[in-house]
């Protein structure tokens, strides 16, 4: 179900030599954080699943991680066992109220080392309300600044659009991780997303870089999945991460339980894939 499960253990799903990524050494101290935006304007590509489970995997390796739920659907919040509709104050208040204290809005999760800045449907109003703000693309970057020294990684779970909220996430980020479903239709939107990233880099955030494209929902039993993955590697080369996330019912089961897959089913191949992804990103320098 994941790239490790091939006929030749030395090759990945598309025949590339598959490196072994070592376990990350412990950190002597924490912070300042590297901010990673998880973006794809197409929904249903495993973006929130990746945000939650990669964050939990990094926390398992001793990294302090903050997830910023930046989707009005609040899926990352729900997936971590927090009911966003019951919250009076969320990331929306942080964006709209200059005197809002980010520390008071951060929620601790059941996973040690993993915190959450939650969102709910209120966030949908921010897109319109921010239009009249000065430096409206940089509001999230400003609001995150007070906690960057408290974490090693901040992961922003973006909504499936390329609107002002996503531009805010890209302006606040050092890197972008692009989850890409192994379906032909999913390929079509990546060029537009890359174009948006380049515009933000040119106009708002020159440090922004693509940390990697992550193939998700891969099913090695289907020719379709294998062909899509081959096309992605042909098109994007080394930007495509070695780790591939397989399709499994364990992800929705874990989400319903409000737990990352690494806690819900730690021995499952899906949990091991996200641990491998965490090791790969550390090895690539995307995470300390």
For each predicted feature, which ranges?
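P-loop NTP-binding core
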Residues: 1-288
């Amino acid at each position: 179900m994941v790239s490790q499960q091939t006929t030749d253990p030395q090759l990945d799903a598309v025949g590339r030599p598959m490196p072994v990524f070592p376990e990350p050494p412990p950190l002597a101290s924490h912070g300042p954080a590297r901010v990673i935006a998880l973006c794809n304007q197409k929904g249903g590509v495993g973006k929130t699943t990746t945000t939650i489970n990669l964050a939990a995997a990094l926390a398992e390796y001793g990294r302090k991680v903050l997830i910023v739920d930046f989707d009005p659907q609040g899926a990352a919040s729900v997936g971590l066992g927090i009911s966003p509709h019951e919250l009076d104050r969320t990331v929306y208040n942080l964006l709209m109220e200059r005197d809002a204290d980010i520390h008071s809005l951060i929620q601790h999760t059941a996973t040690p080392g993993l915190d959450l800045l939650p969102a709910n449907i209120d966030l949908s109003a921010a897109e319109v309300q921010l239009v009249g703000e000065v430096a409206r693309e940089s509001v999230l970057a400003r609001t995150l600044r007070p906690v960057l020294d408290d974490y090693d990684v901040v992961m922003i779970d973006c909504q499936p659009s390329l609107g002002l909220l996503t531009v805010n996430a890209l302006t606040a980020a050092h890197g972008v991780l692009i989850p890409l479903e192994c379906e032909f239709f999913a390929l079509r939107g990546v060029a537009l997303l890359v174009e948006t990233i380049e515009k933000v880099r040119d106009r708002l955030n020159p440090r922004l870089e693509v940390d990697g494209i992550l193939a998700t929902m891969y099913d090695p039993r289907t020719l379709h999945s294998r062909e899509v993955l081959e096309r992605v590697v042909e098109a994007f080369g080394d930007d495509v991460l070695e780790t591939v996330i397989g399709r499994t019912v364990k992800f929705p089961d874990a989400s319903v339980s409000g737990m990352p897959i690494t806690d819900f089913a730690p021995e499952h191949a899906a949990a091991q894939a996200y641990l491998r992804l965490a090791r790969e990103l550390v090895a690539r320098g995307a995470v300390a």
